[in-house]
UniProtKB/Swiss-Prot annotation:
Similarity field: Belongs to the UPF0229 family.
Alphabetical list of PANTHER family matching this protein: UPF0229 PROTEIN YEAH (PTHR30510:SF2)
Biased composition (Basic and acidic residues): 58-76
NCBIfam families from the UniProt entry: PRK05325.1-2, PRK05325.1-3
Protein name stated in the entry: UPF0229 protein Nham_0975
Location of the region described as Disordered in the Swiss-Prot/TrEMBL record: 39-106
A Pfam family that the UniProt record links to this protein: DUF444
Protein backbone atom coordinates (compact mmCIF):
# COMPACT_ATOMS: atom_id res chain seq x y z
CA UNK A 1 0.00 0.00 0.00
CA UNK A 2 1.58 3.32 -1.02
CA UNK A 3 2.19 5.93 1.67
CA UNK A 4 1.95 9.62 0.78
CA UNK A 5 3.77 12.18 2.90
CA UNK A 6 2.60 15.77 2.52
CA UNK A 7 5.72 17.95 2.58
CA UNK A 8 4.09 21.08 1.22
CA UNK A 9 4.81 24.27 3.10
CA UNK A 10 1.19 25.32 2.69
CA UNK A 11 -1.03 22.25 3.25
CA UNK A 12 -4.81 21.99 3.48
CA UNK A 13 -5.41 24.69 0.87
CA UNK A 14 -4.58 27.47 3.33
CA UNK A 15 -3.18 30.73 2.05
CA UNK A 16 0.59 30.89 2.46
CA UNK A 17 0.42 34.57 3.29
CA UNK A 18 -2.20 34.00 5.97
CA UNK A 19 -0.19 31.14 7.43
CA UNK A 20 2.96 33.25 7.71
CA UNK A 21 0.94 36.09 9.21
CA UNK A 22 -0.50 33.69 11.77
CA UNK A 23 2.95 32.43 12.77
CA UNK A 24 4.25 35.96 13.19
CA UNK A 25 1.23 36.93 15.29
CA UNK A 26 1.58 33.90 17.55
CA UNK A 27 5.31 34.56 17.95
CA UNK A 28 4.69 38.14 19.05
CA UNK A 29 2.10 36.94 21.58
CA UNK A 30 4.63 34.45 22.98
CA UNK A 31 7.37 37.07 23.26
CA UNK A 32 5.00 39.54 24.92
CA UNK A 33 3.81 36.94 27.42
CA UNK A 34 7.36 35.92 28.38
CA UNK A 35 8.51 39.52 28.79
CA UNK A 36 5.51 40.39 30.96
CA UNK A 37 6.21 37.41 33.22
CA UNK A 38 9.86 38.34 33.62
CA UNK A 39 9.06 42.01 34.31
CA UNK A 40 6.63 41.05 37.07
CA UNK A 41 8.69 38.18 38.50
CA UNK A 42 12.33 37.29 38.94
CA UNK A 43 14.83 37.65 36.10
CA UNK A 44 16.18 34.17 36.81
CA UNK A 45 12.73 32.76 36.00
CA UNK A 46 13.64 33.12 32.33
CA UNK A 47 16.28 30.41 32.77
CA UNK A 48 13.82 27.51 32.76
CA UNK A 49 10.56 26.21 31.37
CA UNK A 50 7.66 28.64 31.05
CA UNK A 51 3.93 27.91 30.88
CA UNK A 52 2.69 30.54 28.43
CA UNK A 53 -0.90 31.57 27.70
CA UNK A 54 -2.01 33.45 24.61
CA UNK A 55 -5.57 34.42 23.57
CA UNK A 56 -7.30 31.76 21.49
CA UNK A 57 -8.23 34.36 18.88
CA UNK A 58 -4.52 34.77 18.12
CA UNK A 59 -4.21 31.12 17.11
CA UNK A 60 -7.06 31.16 14.58
CA UNK A 61 -6.16 31.44 10.91
CA UNK A 62 -8.20 33.89 8.80
CA UNK A 63 -10.83 32.29 6.57
CA UNK A 64 -13.73 33.32 4.36
CA UNK A 65 -17.26 32.47 5.46
CA UNK A 66 -20.77 33.73 4.76
CA UNK A 67 -21.88 36.67 6.90
CA UNK A 68 -24.63 35.63 9.28
CA UNK A 69 -26.45 38.97 9.39
CA UNK A 70 -26.43 40.03 5.72
CA UNK A 71 -26.89 38.71 2.19
CA UNK A 72 -29.63 36.59 0.63
CA UNK A 73 -29.79 32.82 1.02
CA UNK A 74 -32.23 29.98 0.42
CA UNK A 75 -32.89 27.12 2.84
CA UNK A 76 -34.80 23.87 2.69
CA UNK A 77 -36.80 23.69 5.94
CA UNK A 78 -39.24 21.10 7.28
CA UNK A 79 -42.95 21.80 6.78
CA UNK A 80 -45.03 23.78 9.28
CA UNK A 81 -48.50 25.24 9.78
CA UNK A 82 -47.61 28.91 9.30
CA UNK A 83 -45.69 29.14 6.00
CA UNK A 84 -46.17 27.81 2.50
CA UNK A 85 -43.69 27.65 -0.41
CA UNK A 86 -42.95 31.13 -1.77
CA UNK A 87 -43.39 33.03 1.52
CA UNK A 88 -40.65 35.54 2.37
CA UNK A 89 -39.24 35.72 5.89
CA UNK A 90 -38.09 38.93 7.51
CA UNK A 91 -34.58 39.01 8.92
CA UNK A 92 -34.61 39.30 12.71
CA UNK A 93 -33.11 42.55 13.95
CA UNK A 94 -30.34 42.79 16.52
CA UNK A 95 -31.63 41.85 19.95
CA UNK A 96 -34.87 40.47 18.50
CA UNK A 97 -36.28 37.03 19.04
CA UNK A 98 -33.85 34.35 18.03
CA UNK A 99 -30.75 36.24 19.20
CA UNK A 100 -28.89 34.06 21.70
CA UNK A 101 -28.46 35.36 25.21
CA UNK A 102 -24.85 36.45 25.90
CA UNK A 103 -24.66 33.99 28.78
CA UNK A 104 -25.45 31.15 26.38
CA UNK A 105 -22.66 31.94 23.91
CA UNK A 106 -19.73 29.55 23.64
CA UNK A 107 -16.35 30.70 24.88
CA UNK A 108 -12.86 29.25 24.82
CA UNK A 109 -10.05 29.43 27.36
CA UNK A 110 -6.68 30.89 26.46
CA UNK A 111 -4.30 28.63 24.56
CA UNK A 112 -1.79 27.41 27.17
CA UNK A 113 1.35 25.33 26.66
CA UNK A 114 4.87 24.90 28.05
CA UNK A 115 7.99 26.22 26.34
CA UNK A 116 11.38 24.63 27.00
CA UNK A 117 14.29 26.62 28.44
CA UNK A 118 15.93 26.93 25.01
CA UNK A 119 12.70 28.15 23.40
CA UNK A 120 12.15 30.70 26.18
CA UNK A 121 15.65 32.13 25.89
CA UNK A 122 15.53 32.19 22.08
CA UNK A 123 12.31 34.22 22.17
CA UNK A 124 13.53 36.39 25.03
CA UNK A 125 16.80 37.40 23.33
CA UNK A 126 15.68 37.01 19.72
CA UNK A 127 16.70 40.42 18.38
CA UNK A 128 19.54 41.23 20.79
CA UNK A 129 23.27 40.77 20.32
CA UNK A 130 26.60 42.22 21.30
CA UNK A 131 27.37 45.27 19.16
CA UNK A 132 29.86 44.14 16.54
CA UNK A 133 31.85 47.26 15.71
CA UNK A 134 34.88 45.32 14.49
CA UNK A 135 38.26 46.93 15.13
CA UNK A 136 40.14 48.12 12.10
CA UNK A 137 43.25 46.24 13.23
CA UNK A 138 41.37 42.94 13.66
CA UNK A 139 41.53 41.08 10.35
CA UNK A 140 38.75 38.71 9.47
CA UNK A 141 40.67 35.43 9.20
CA UNK A 142 38.89 32.10 9.46
CA UNK A 143 40.34 29.08 11.18
CA UNK A 144 39.35 25.60 10.08
CA UNK A 145 38.74 22.37 11.93
CA UNK A 146 38.05 18.93 10.45
CA UNK A 147 34.49 17.67 10.61
CA UNK A 148 33.25 14.15 9.84
CA UNK A 149 31.46 14.08 6.49
CA UNK A 150 30.66 10.44 5.74
CA UNK A 151 32.87 8.01 3.83
CA UNK A 152 34.99 8.08 0.68
CA UNK A 153 36.39 5.42 -1.65
CA UNK A 154 39.84 7.05 -1.60
CA UNK A 155 41.91 8.50 1.18
CA UNK A 156 44.88 8.12 3.46
CA UNK A 157 45.57 4.67 4.95
CA UNK A 158 45.41 6.23 8.40
CA UNK A 159 41.76 7.17 7.77
CA UNK A 160 40.57 3.72 6.71
CA UNK A 161 37.27 2.72 8.31
CA UNK A 162 37.65 -0.97 9.13
CA UNK A 163 34.02 -1.50 10.10
CA UNK A 164 32.58 -0.05 6.91
CA UNK A 165 35.23 -1.84 4.79
CA UNK A 166 34.46 -5.25 6.29
CA UNK A 167 30.74 -4.71 5.91
CA UNK A 168 31.17 -3.97 2.20
CA UNK A 169 33.44 -7.02 1.86
CA UNK A 170 30.93 -9.28 3.58
CA UNK A 171 28.09 -8.10 1.36
CA UNK A 172 30.12 -8.59 -1.82
CA UNK A 173 31.20 -12.12 -0.79
CA UNK A 174 27.59 -13.09 -0.10
CA UNK A 175 26.40 -11.65 -3.42
CA UNK A 176 29.12 -13.45 -5.43
CA UNK A 177 28.77 -16.65 -3.37
CA UNK A 178 32.43 -16.93 -2.45
CA UNK A 179 33.10 -20.39 -0.97
CA UNK A 180 33.86 -20.45 2.72
CA UNK A 181 36.98 -22.04 4.15
CA UNK A 182 34.81 -24.46 6.14
CA UNK A 183 33.29 -25.87 2.93
CA UNK A 184 36.73 -26.63 1.43
CA UNK A 185 37.99 -28.15 4.68
CA UNK A 186 34.93 -30.41 4.90
CA UNK A 187 35.54 -31.76 1.37
CA UNK A 188 39.24 -32.40 2.10
CA UNK A 189 38.27 -34.22 5.28
CA UNK A 190 35.97 -36.45 3.24
CA UNK A 191 38.78 -37.13 0.73
CA UNK A 192 41.12 -38.15 3.55
CA UNK A 193 38.54 -40.56 4.96
CA UNK A 194 37.99 -42.13 1.54
CA UNK A 195 41.73 -42.52 0.92
CA UNK A 196 42.21 -44.25 4.27
CA UNK A 197 39.54 -46.83 3.42
CA UNK A 198 39.21 -49.46 0.72
CA UNK A 199 40.29 -48.28 -2.73
CA UNK A 200 37.29 -49.50 -4.66
CA UNK A 201 36.50 -48.11 -8.12
CA UNK A 202 33.56 -46.22 -6.66
CA UNK A 203 35.76 -44.70 -3.95
CA UNK A 204 38.43 -43.66 -6.46
CA UNK A 205 35.76 -42.08 -8.67
CA UNK A 206 34.36 -40.22 -5.65
CA UNK A 207 37.82 -39.01 -4.64
CA UNK A 208 38.47 -37.67 -8.15
CA UNK A 209 35.16 -35.81 -8.13
CA UNK A 210 35.86 -34.29 -4.72
CA UNK A 211 39.36 -33.21 -5.75
CA UNK A 212 37.92 -31.51 -8.82
CA UNK A 213 35.39 -29.75 -6.57
CA UNK A 214 38.18 -28.60 -4.24
CA UNK A 215 40.11 -27.15 -7.19
CA UNK A 216 36.99 -25.38 -8.42
CA UNK A 217 36.25 -23.89 -4.98
CA UNK A 218 39.87 -22.83 -4.47
CA UNK A 219 39.93 -21.19 -7.89
CA UNK A 220 36.71 -19.31 -7.07
CA UNK A 221 38.13 -18.23 -3.70
CA UNK A 222 41.19 -16.84 -5.49
CA UNK A 223 39.07 -14.97 -8.02
CA UNK A 224 36.75 -13.52 -5.37
CA UNK A 225 39.09 -11.83 -2.90
CA UNK A 226 38.27 -11.70 0.78
CA UNK A 227 38.81 -7.91 0.76
CA UNK A 228 38.76 -6.21 -2.61
CA UNK A 229 39.90 -2.63 -3.27
CA UNK A 230 36.30 -1.83 -4.16
CA UNK A 231 35.30 -2.62 -0.57
CA UNK A 232 37.68 -0.20 1.13
CA UNK A 233 36.15 2.92 2.65
CA UNK A 234 37.89 5.84 4.29
CA UNK A 235 36.62 8.33 6.82
CA UNK A 236 35.92 11.58 4.99
CA UNK A 237 36.54 14.94 6.63
CA UNK A 238 35.58 18.45 5.55
CA UNK A 239 37.27 21.63 6.67
CA UNK A 240 34.65 23.54 8.64
CA UNK A 241 35.39 27.28 8.96
CA UNK A 242 35.21 28.70 12.46
CA UNK A 243 35.63 32.38 13.35
CA UNK A 244 38.87 33.16 15.09
CA UNK A 245 37.34 36.17 16.83
CA UNK A 246 37.16 35.60 20.58
CA UNK A 247 35.03 37.70 22.93
CA UNK A 248 35.19 38.41 26.64
CA UNK A 249 32.62 40.29 28.73
CA UNK A 250 33.70 42.10 31.90
CA UNK A 251 30.96 42.51 34.52
CA UNK A 252 31.82 45.25 37.05
CA UNK A 253 29.51 45.71 40.06
CA UNK A 254 29.70 48.16 42.96
CA UNK A 255 29.06 46.35 46.27
CA UNK A 256 30.11 49.20 48.58
CA UNK A 257 28.19 50.44 51.60
CA UNK A 258 26.41 53.14 49.59
CA UNK A 259 24.73 50.39 47.58
CA UNK A 260 21.75 49.36 49.72
CA UNK A 261 19.91 46.08 49.44
CA UNK A 262 17.55 47.54 46.85
CA UNK A 263 20.37 48.88 44.68
CA UNK A 264 22.33 45.63 44.90
CA UNK A 265 19.24 43.63 44.04
CA UNK A 266 18.59 45.71 40.90
CA UNK A 267 22.24 45.50 39.86
CA UNK A 268 22.28 41.73 40.34
CA UNK A 269 19.05 41.39 38.36
CA UNK A 270 20.65 43.28 35.49
CA UNK A 271 23.75 41.09 35.54
CA UNK A 272 21.68 37.89 35.82
CA UNK A 273 19.87 38.95 32.65
CA UNK A 274 23.20 39.72 30.98
CA UNK A 275 24.59 36.36 32.09
CA UNK A 276 21.61 34.46 30.65
CA UNK A 277 21.90 36.44 27.43
CA UNK A 278 25.57 35.59 26.97
CA UNK A 279 25.09 31.90 27.79
CA UNK A 280 22.17 31.66 25.37
CA UNK A 281 23.59 33.52 22.37
CA UNK A 282 27.38 33.22 22.60
CA UNK A 283 28.82 29.82 23.54
CA UNK A 284 32.43 30.95 23.09
CA UNK A 285 32.21 34.20 25.06
CA UNK A 286 34.17 34.26 28.32
CA UNK A 287 32.81 36.19 31.30
CA UNK A 288 34.96 37.90 33.93
CA UNK A 289 33.23 39.00 37.17
CA UNK A 290 34.74 41.92 39.11
CA UNK A 291 33.17 43.28 42.31
CA UNK A 292 34.58 46.32 44.08
CA UNK A 293 34.32 48.41 47.22
CA UNK A 294 37.41 50.50 48.02
CA UNK A 295 39.32 47.64 46.41
CA UNK A 296 38.46 45.38 43.47
CA UNK A 297 38.81 41.66 43.06
CA UNK A 298 38.00 39.08 40.42
CA UNK A 299 35.42 36.60 41.73
CA UNK A 300 33.56 33.58 40.47
CA UNK A 301 29.94 33.55 39.37
CA UNK A 302 28.51 32.40 42.71
CA UNK A 303 30.42 34.99 44.74
CA UNK A 304 29.48 37.73 42.29
CA UNK A 305 25.75 37.11 42.60
CA UNK A 306 25.42 36.00 46.22
CA UNK A 307 28.23 37.66 48.18
CA UNK A 308 27.29 40.05 51.04
CA UNK A 309 30.59 41.96 50.95
CA UNK A 310 30.50 45.70 51.72
CA UNK A 311 32.90 48.60 52.26
CA UNK A 312 33.95 52.00 50.91
CA UNK A 313 33.70 53.18 47.31
CA UNK A 314 36.62 53.63 44.91
CA UNK A 315 35.36 52.92 41.40
CA UNK A 316 38.74 53.33 39.72
CA UNK A 317 39.99 50.14 41.40
CA UNK A 318 37.57 48.09 39.29
CA UNK A 319 38.76 49.76 36.08
CA UNK A 320 42.40 49.21 37.06
CA UNK A 321 41.68 45.56 37.80
CA UNK A 322 39.97 45.17 34.45
CA UNK A 323 42.91 46.77 32.64
CA UNK A 324 45.40 44.45 34.37
CA UNK A 325 43.36 41.36 33.46
CA UNK A 326 43.18 42.50 29.83
CA UNK A 327 46.95 42.98 29.73
CA UNK A 328 47.58 39.56 31.26
CA UNK A 329 45.00 37.34 29.54
CA UNK A 330 43.07 39.13 26.80
CA UNK A 331 45.30 41.03 24.33
CA UNK A 332 43.25 43.51 22.36
CA UNK A 333 44.66 42.29 19.03
CA UNK A 334 43.12 38.84 19.56
CA UNK A 335 39.99 39.44 21.65
CA UNK A 336 36.79 41.43 21.25
CA UNK A 337 36.38 43.04 24.67
CA UNK A 338 33.04 44.15 26.14
CA UNK A 339 32.23 45.59 29.55
CA UNK A 340 29.12 46.31 31.62
CA UNK A 341 29.28 48.31 34.85
CA UNK A 342 26.58 48.86 37.48
CA UNK A 343 26.86 51.39 40.32
CA UNK A 344 24.81 53.90 42.30
CA UNK A 345 27.14 56.66 41.09
CA UNK A 346 28.42 57.53 44.57
CA UNK A 347 32.14 58.24 44.18
CA UNK A 348 34.69 60.84 45.22
CA UNK A 349 35.25 63.63 42.69
CA UNK A 350 38.99 62.97 42.55
CA UNK A 351 38.43 59.28 41.86
CA UNK A 352 35.84 60.11 39.19
CA UNK A 353 38.52 62.08 37.35
CA UNK A 354 40.79 59.05 37.69
CA UNK A 355 38.03 56.95 36.07
CA UNK A 356 37.84 59.38 33.14
CA UNK A 357 41.60 59.09 32.62
CA UNK A 358 41.54 55.29 32.72
CA UNK A 359 38.64 55.07 30.28
CA UNK A 360 39.90 57.68 27.82
CA UNK A 361 43.55 56.65 27.77
CA UNK A 362 43.48 52.89 28.37
CA UNK A 363 40.19 51.01 28.37
CA UNK A 364 37.96 52.52 25.68
CA UNK A 365 40.58 52.08 22.97
CA UNK A 366 40.58 48.35 23.81
CA UNK A 367 36.83 47.82 24.20
CA UNK A 368 34.35 47.08 21.47
CA UNK A 369 31.53 48.27 23.70
CA UNK A 370 31.15 49.62 27.24
CA UNK A 371 27.76 49.92 28.99
CA UNK A 372 27.28 51.82 32.25
CA UNK A 373 24.07 51.37 34.27
CA UNK A 374 23.41 53.67 37.22
CA UNK A 375 20.96 52.57 39.93
CA UNK A 376 18.92 55.53 41.21
CA UNK A 377 16.07 55.93 43.68
CA UNK A 378 12.55 56.04 42.29
CA UNK A 379 12.12 59.53 43.75
CA UNK A 380 15.18 60.70 41.78
CA UNK A 381 13.67 59.71 38.45
CA UNK A 382 12.26 63.20 37.83
CA UNK A 383 15.21 65.01 39.40
CA UNK A 384 17.66 63.23 37.11
CA UNK A 385 15.37 63.42 34.12
CA UNK A 386 18.09 64.88 31.90
CA UNK A 387 21.56 63.59 31.21
CA UNK A 388 23.14 66.80 32.52
CA UNK A 389 21.93 66.14 36.06
CA UNK A 390 23.31 63.27 38.07
CA UNK A 391 25.85 61.94 40.49
CA UNK A 392 29.58 62.59 40.41
CA UNK A 393 30.27 59.42 38.45
CA UNK A 394 27.41 60.11 36.00
CA UNK A 395 28.75 63.57 35.19
CA UNK A 396 32.25 62.15 34.77
CA UNK A 397 31.08 59.40 32.45
CA UNK A 398 29.07 61.92 30.41
CA UNK A 399 32.33 63.30 29.02
CA UNK A 400 33.44 59.78 28.10
CA UNK A 401 30.07 59.19 26.44
CA UNK A 402 30.54 62.33 24.36
CA UNK A 403 33.98 61.25 23.11
CA UNK A 404 33.52 57.54 22.48
CA UNK A 405 30.72 56.19 20.24
CA UNK A 406 31.12 52.70 21.72
CA UNK A 407 30.17 53.94 25.22
CA UNK A 408 26.54 53.83 26.40
CA UNK A 409 25.06 54.91 29.73
CA UNK A 410 21.57 54.76 31.21
CA UNK A 411 19.67 54.66 34.52
CA UNK A 412 17.50 52.10 36.33
CA UNK A 413 15.00 53.14 39.01
CA UNK A 414 12.98 49.96 39.58
CA UNK A 415 12.75 46.35 38.45
CA UNK A 416 10.41 47.19 35.56
CA UNK A 417 13.20 49.29 33.98
CA UNK A 418 15.71 46.45 33.75
CA UNK A 419 14.50 44.71 30.62
CA UNK A 420 13.81 47.91 28.57
CA UNK A 421 17.23 49.26 29.58
CA UNK A 422 18.86 45.96 28.68
CA UNK A 423 17.29 46.05 25.23
CA UNK A 424 18.37 49.66 24.81
CA UNK A 425 21.98 48.80 25.60
CA UNK A 426 22.32 45.62 23.56
CA UNK A 427 20.35 46.37 20.41
CA UNK A 428 22.80 46.66 17.57
CA UNK A 429 20.80 49.22 15.60
CA UNK A 430 20.87 51.78 18.41
CA UNK A 431 24.65 51.63 18.76
CA UNK A 432 25.19 51.66 15.02
CA UNK A 433 22.98 54.76 14.72
CA UNK A 434 24.95 56.49 17.48
CA UNK A 435 28.20 55.71 15.69
CA UNK A 436 26.85 56.98 12.36
CA UNK A 437 25.61 60.27 13.83
CA UNK A 438 28.90 61.05 15.58
CA UNK A 439 30.90 60.41 12.47
Amino acid sequence: MPIFIDRRLNPKDRSLGNRQRFLRRAREELKRSIRDRVRSGRISDADGEQAVSIPTRSTDEPRFEAAKDSGRREHVLPGNKHFVPGDRLRKPGHGAAGTPDPSMKDSEDDFRFVLSREEVLDLFFEDLELPDMVKLSLKEILAFRPRRAGFAATGSPTNINVGRTMRNSYGRRIALKRPKREEVDAIRQEIAELESGSQSPVARQRIAALQAEVERLERKRRLIAYVDPVDIRFNRFEAQPIPNAKAVMFCLMDVSGSMGEREKDLAKRFFVLLHLFLKCRYDRTEIVFISHTHEAQEVNEETFFYSTQSGGTVVSTALEKMHRIIAERYPGSEWNIYAAQASDGDNAAADSHRCITLLDEEIMRLCQYYAYVEIIDERERHIFGTTENGTSLWRAYSSVNANWPNFQMTRIADAADIYPVFRQLFTRQATAEKLRVRR
